[in-house]
């Protein structure tokens, strides 16, 4: 039933990419550190959503449910090598051979999820960053506003590209909205930080007045930093009991772009191609 959450969306440009989705399978054990799980959600299930939305590429993100066991990620990537890339989860004990195998499988980054904390901590960042840099990968971060503000000096000084998940959770802490926004803008001004326009319901609940403010922030980002924005569906929306309509969320972003075809192509095609090593 998972794919049925999608409605109908406006047309996307050719080679549009979903930069944040997950798969789940009962064939792989849930990590002892996991705080979130999901019913099975396969690549075949996702293909229904992908086709309906008009997407041709996707980025498979290792969910916290599997910790550092990236076997499902690698197996899934092997089925669509030209149109998919992966973001893995590793800890500081990872070997060069393991990193090389992930690289061959199509992995282009590692993720630190500090919201549903599990297998990794930010204390591992400095040890892993040189390996990431050597491979030409990036570091993807899921942080709450207070942690983003605290980590900002480290991220600004990082020698690797940084990708912030889920609108950087901009409006998730109302008392920190202004400081979070300023922190985000300063990081993006370095030219080394990307923002993922994914899961707006995690940045602010749809029934919260701040939800509209989130899209006002997005308009400002499009005007000033469109070359550092990518979009992701967050399918299959494991944090949500009532699943959102993927097409409705996508359409809202498309309306915000106000028929700016250059911005749309940047967010859905050109930027993902650069960040995730796709051919343009």
Feature annotation, model-predicted:
Residues 122-231:
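Catalytic pocket-lining loop regions of alpha/beta-barrel enzymes
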Residues 40-48, 92-102, 179-180:
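Short, acidic/polar
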Residues 16-17, 124, 128, 238:
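A generic "structured core" feature
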Residues 32-80:
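Alpha-helical scaffold segments that flank or form the walls of functional sites
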Residues 1-15, 39-57, 220-228, 242-280:
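Mid-to-C-terminal alpha-helical segments outside catalytic/metal-binding sites
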Residues 67-153, 196-203:
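Active-site gating/metal-coordination segments in enzymes
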Residues 20, 73, 110, 132, ...:
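Conserved, mostly hydrophobic/aromatic
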Residues 17-21, 58-61, 84-88, 108-112, ...:
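Hydrophobic faces of well-ordered beta-strands that scaffold small-molecule active sites
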């Amino acid at each position: 039933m998972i794919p049925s959450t999608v409605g109908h969306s406006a047309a996307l440009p050719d080679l549009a990419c979903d930069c944040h989705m997950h798969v789940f399978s009962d064939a792989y054990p849930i990590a002892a550190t996991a705080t979130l799980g999901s019913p099975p959600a396969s690549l075949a299930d996702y293909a229904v959503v992908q086709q309906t939305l008009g997407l041709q590429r996707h980025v498979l993100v290792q969910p916290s449910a599997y910790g550092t066991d990236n076997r499902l990620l690698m197996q899934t990537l092997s089925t669509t090598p030209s149109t998919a890339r992966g973001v893995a989860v590793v800890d500081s004990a990872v070997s060069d051979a393991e990193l090389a195998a992930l690289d061959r499988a199509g992995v282009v980054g590692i993720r630190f999820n500090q919201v549903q904390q599990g297998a990794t901590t930010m204390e591992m960042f400095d040890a892993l960053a040189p390996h990431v840099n050597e491979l030409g990968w990036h570091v993807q971060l899921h942080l709450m506003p207070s942690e983003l503000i605290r980590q900002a000096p480290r991220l600004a000084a990082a020698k690797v590209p940084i990708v912030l998940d889920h609108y950087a959770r901009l409006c998730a802490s109302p008392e920190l909205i202004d400081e979070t926004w300023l922190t985000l803008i300063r990081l993006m001004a370095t030219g080394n930080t990307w923002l993922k326009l994914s899961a707006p319901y995690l940045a602010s609940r749809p029934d919260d007045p701040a939800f509209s403010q989130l899209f006002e922030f997005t308009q400002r980002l499009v005007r000033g930093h469109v070359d550092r924005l990518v979009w992701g569906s967050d399918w299959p929306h494991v944090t949500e009991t009532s699943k959102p309509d993927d097409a409705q969320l996508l359409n809202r972003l498309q309306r915000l772009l106000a028929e700016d075809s250059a911005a749309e192509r940047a967010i859905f095609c050109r930027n993902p191609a650069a960040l995730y090593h796709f051919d343009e």
